[in-house]
Amino acid sequence: MKLEHVAIDVADPEKLIAWGCENLGFRRSAPGSAFIIDDSGMMGLEIYRTGETSAAPDYAKMNAMTLHVAFVSEDVKADVDRLVAAGATLETLKVDNPAFHMAILRDPWGVPVQLCKREHTIFFK
């Protein structure tokens, strides 16, 4: 099996989709779609609101290690600066190990975003 997408229930899907497309390199799979696809075209997120009476999860109060969306970054520090300027909040920045640079941020709605630069990929070649 191959992973297709991860679904995230948020209070304001349209705003999160717009921010993700503008700042994280996503694009909608089709106009008006809840699916946004990364620049590889191989992985996507479904950003939606369930429409139920219960509130969307409060991602800002969750530990970022419980759920986060991770991205490969060629320059973690530069991407942190760019995302913070776009409204993200920095929680953790670790760039002292040359084999692994990492940052945890939260988008403007509290959803955790991880940036990673690894010496060796976690994927099979």
Where are the language model's segments positioned?
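Short amphipathic alpha-helices within nucleic acid-binding modules
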Residues: 19, 77-82
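Loop/turn position at the start of each blade in beta-propeller repeats
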Residues: 1, 64, 98-100
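Short hydrophobic/aromatic beta-strand element in the GNAT-like acyltransferase core
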Residues: 44, 70, 102-104
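Vicinal oxygen chelate
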Residues: 80-125
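Conserved short beta-strand elements that form part of the metal-binding/catalytic scaffold
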Residues: 27-61, 112-118
